[in-house]
Amino acid sequence: MLVFYGFLSSRSISHLKVYLVGGAVRDQLLGLPVKEKDWVVVGATPEEMTARGFKPVGKEFPVFLHPETHEEYALARTERKVAKGYKGFTFYAAPDVSLEEDLKRRDLTINAIAETPEGQLIDPYGGQEDLKNKVLRHVSVAFQEDPVRVLRLARLATKFPDFSIHPDTLELMKKMVCAGEIDALVPERIWQELNRALGNEKPTRFFTVLNQCGALAILFPEIKMEGKGMAALQSVTDKTPSPLIRFATLQSDLPPEIIQKLAGRYRVPNEYADLAILVARFGSDYVNLNRMDETSLLNFLLKTDALRRQERFDQFIFTCDLISSTTSSQPKKIKEIIKAVKSVDIKPLQEKQLKGEAFAKALEKLRLEAIRTLIS
């Protein structure tokens, strides 16, 4: 047995035909850690699963959570395309659906391998051979029916950068793009796959694959393969695993308003959008800090909101330093300036009962004096 920890002892699944499937089997065969396990149940009904204590969670097809492990158990099913888009399917889940039929509906051969409780591998579509040859290949032409598979394959290519895409699979992806299937993708799923890709070993390959099949110009027209942002992402990949930092790096050569438009289109979290816009808008100013006088430095701190949002500003300077690929004293210097500005004593201003514009001008004067003392 490979990863069936405690499998046979569970009363909830005794006498059921249960198989481990998908990424868990694939990663185990590749010697990678298994992060989550998905199971397929053959020959059972929804009523039988609930009677055993499983909690139904699937809206479109029968998926259940194990009462103890909370892992997902799905009844074996087939699917049929009835409309455009990733939701344009009807599903058939019944006791007469075989394991092989269930595996056939999966996207890639390396994800269509099942494992029995005894550790026997069931591989009707050549997944093990493709793992050996490092090939990403579709199970059947039904691959082209689900546009999400284009994103998933592009993301998987970032996780396994030494795997090639089978020519026939790439042709199917191109057909999907030409047929307009990509247009049916929802913003949330596009962002989900992009964010996951940014955290993988070679994130630039996500865009390379999308470009190869023609989807890049449709989904991300702002991003150019030959752009400085792509080159910057490539250069920082081995320096930070953070999807947040990598996202900001990728868009560092774009105008802030373009970044805002992209972020709005795909409902990118504010944390990501804010940092990317900050880097694009003020990155060049940060590089030239040594040339600034006290007035310019204070304006820089206020515009970047460095005095109030220290964590975001730290992410900003970290990103800028990665992009510039230089080791400098800039971070230390700017942090000393921030500390000095924050340490300005405002009690004398309060004692004078200064308010409004008078208070603001007096505070600015004290801050400028604090900065001048440090840089002079």
Swiss-Prot record:
GO terms for MF: ATP binding; CCA tRNA nucleotidyltransferase activity; CCACCA tRNA nucleotidyltransferase activity; magnesium ion binding; tRNA binding
Enzyme Commission numbers on file: 2.7.7.72
Chain sites annotated for binding Mg(2+): E36, D38
One Pfam assignment: PolyA_pol_RNAbd
Binding site for ATP: G23, R26, R106, R152, R155
Enzyme superclass (EC): transferase
Job of this protein: Catalyzes the addition and repair of the essential 3'-terminal CCA sequence in tRNAs without using a nucleic acid template. Adds these three nucleotides in the order of C, C, and A to the tRNA nucleotide-73, using CTP and ATP as substrates and producing inorganic pyrophosphate. tRNA 3'-terminal CCA addition is required both for tRNA processing and repair. Also involved in tRNA surveillance by mediating tandem CCA addition to generate a CCACCA at the 3' terminus of unstable tRNAs. While stable tRNAs receive only 3'-terminal CCA, unstable tRNAs are marked with CCACCA and rapidly degraded.
Protein name as it appears in the record: CCA-adding enzyme
Species of the source: Coxiella burnetii (strain RSA 493 / Nine Mile phase I)
Gene name of the encoded protein: cca
